[in-house]
Amino acid sequence: MKRDVRILLLGEAQVGKTSLILSLVGEEFPEEVPARAEEITIPADVTPEKVPTHIVDYSETEQTVEELQGEIDKADVVCVVYDVSEEATVEKIRTKWIPLVNGDTKRGPRVPIILVGNKSDLRPGGSMEAVLPIMSQFPEIETCVECSAKNLKNISELFYYAQKAVLHPTAPLYDPEAKQLRPACAQALTRIFRLSDQDMDQALSDQELNAFQTSCFGHPLAPQALEDVKMVVSKNVVGGVRDDQLTLDGFLFLNTLFIQRGRHETTWTILRRFGYGDSLELTADYLCPPLRVPPGCSAELNHRGYQFVQRMFEKHDQDRDGALSPAELQSLFSVFPAAPWGPHLPSTVRTKAGRLPLHGYLCQWTLVTYLDVRRSLEHLGYLGYPTLCEQDSQAHAITVTREKRLDQEKGQTQRNVLLCKVVGARGVGKSSFLRAFLGHSLGHQDAGEPSVYAIDTVQVNGQEKYLILCEVAADSLLTASADASCDVACLMFDGSDLRSFALCASVYKQHYMDGQTPCLFVCSKADLPGGVPLPGLSPAEFCRRHRLPTPTLFSCAGPVEPCMGIFTRLATMATFPHLVHGQLQATSFWLRVALGAMGAAVAAILSFSLYRVLVKSR
């Protein structure tokens, strides 16, 4: 919605333009009227719509044609004033003023026009019969107001309607010739209806209608008012009410009726509550609310975000089988301009028999939020998070983690989403490693484009963590501008071709050797015979020299089954980033924790025994 309104008054000389402005400001008819009033600004707190309003007068004797055109170009709405007692001024509306306003304007959309019949005190019968044909001819005319500057009749109403024509314009909503909603308006209202239909039965129950009414207007409908609404719809629209519930056709009819009766601000209130702007597109402020993620921090869905997206899952899981079919996914994404995850099931998560289970669905939301929080905010906006959850914005569903440097200083991370970069030469088995993480066999092929990401949950010390694997070609990290940052690095080499180890070693030395990122070397294709040793340090010797864990064997084929424990180990290393020098052998690490606790207990017992000896010696 516009932040201020600029109203321009035009018309023939002596029709009372200046008198109208001065009567509004002074609340009395001026005895002396200048040729032209100065521009007046009405503060926001004294206007019905709480928007600053600028009122601009025009005088043909004081202003040039160029100055007039400049004022028209700046105006948000034009009030064409005529004298109800002078028919010639009415005819000038059609032949002079409307062509001048919208015939030569270069801005594109037509400027809304309010017809103002002044001096109604001189003609009690009014002039509506004369102006109705003009209103039918020019759709940009919003309304006609008859008033009297002398009697102060309808003065404030005149400027209210002018303000309303800017803030709640009819033209984007309604086609007066076809007497129906414009396509963009119908599309926006259809999306709003689908978001409000919580049980997916293609109709709004009394409970859903009252939730909608409360969200948009701050209070529910009285029971009798609710029945009256449904009665009006059922009398005018076949199928508008079904089983005592309002259908989409009935909902669209109601909004058409509001507009036809001059209450288009009602429809605009609904549209703006659900994020729409003057162009009937979701606004940038709505889709991308302010959310700062400082360097070294990351974004995650919080419990409110997970509750909402799970609620959307359950809403569209119509067969209650715990998974979304392609048709159910299409239903979920029907309120988006396009399917955000592509035409196929995401290849980044676990799927089941061509369906997306809740676990994989939550993983996909987690991945999108971590990689591109702006995109995640957009998706939450399309699903109606701010309105349905009664929050200012969908940023309420996001948590920004503390800086990684603080995690490293404290020796433990509070993050629930961990990034592991799987680095290696081409052909060492990185893609197979990602597929194994998702429980796929070596020969598994995804329906869509393969992804360099995979995400699943792992248990770390009894807590569930989301682990993201990101496949990275080792040679791409050897450039000066490469970004190797992550929570844990998995450096993969082919055990049957040890030349691939040299690349991993180079990446380690360039990016990780002097840092605090935990690293694990992984020897892939462990089912194949070992490669010919090369001059220099062997992988095991290299790891020992750099105080790294011994390379872990991994295979997706042959007699060696994929060891899923490797993924838990990577997540554990990321959770405890201070243990970067091979200290995180699963058994020895927890053994030291236990021994430390035991040592503390023994020390306490010895101290207590010594205390008893000292007491007895006294």
From Swiss-Prot:
Q: PROSITE patterns in the record, alphabetically?
A: EF_HAND_1, EF_HAND_2, MIRO
Residues assigned to the Cytoplasmic compartment are: 1-592
> Major location, coarse class?
mitochondrion
Q: What reactions does this protein catalyze?
A: GTP + H2O = GDP + phosphate + H(+); ATP + H2O = ADP + phosphate + H(+); UTP + H2O = UDP + phosphate + H(+)
Instruction: Please list the residues that bind Ca(2+) 1.
Output: D197, D199, D201, E208
GO cellular component terms listed in the entry, alphabetical order: mitochondrial outer membrane
Q: Where is the EF-hand domain?
A: 184-219, 304-339
Q: Where in the cell is it found?
A: Mitochondrion outer membrane
Q: Which residues lie on this side of the membrane: Mitochondrial intermembrane?
A: 616-618
Q: Which of this chain's residues are annotated to bind Mg(2+) 2?
A: S431, E471
Q: Where does Mg(2+) 1 bind?
A: T18, D57
What is this entry's stated membrane topology?
Single-pass type IV membrane protein
Annotated membrane-spanning segments are: 593-615
> What is the role of the protein in this entry?
Atypical mitochondrial nucleoside-triphosphatase (NTPase) involved in mitochondrial trafficking. Probably involved in control of anterograde transport of mitochondria and their subcellular distribution. Can hydrolyze GTP, ATP and UTP.
Q: How does it assemble?
A: Homodimer. Interacts with the kinesin-binding proteins TRAK1/OIP106 and TRAK2/GRIF1, forming a link between mitochondria and the trafficking apparatus of the microtubules. Interacts with ARMCX3. Found in a complex with KIF5B, OGT, RHOT1 and TRAK1.
To which protein family does this belong? Answer: Belongs to the mitochondrial Rho GTPase family.
**What protein name is recorded for this chain?**
Mitochondrial Rho GTPase 2
Species this protein is from: Bos taurus (Bovine)
Q: Which gene encodes it?
A: RHOT2
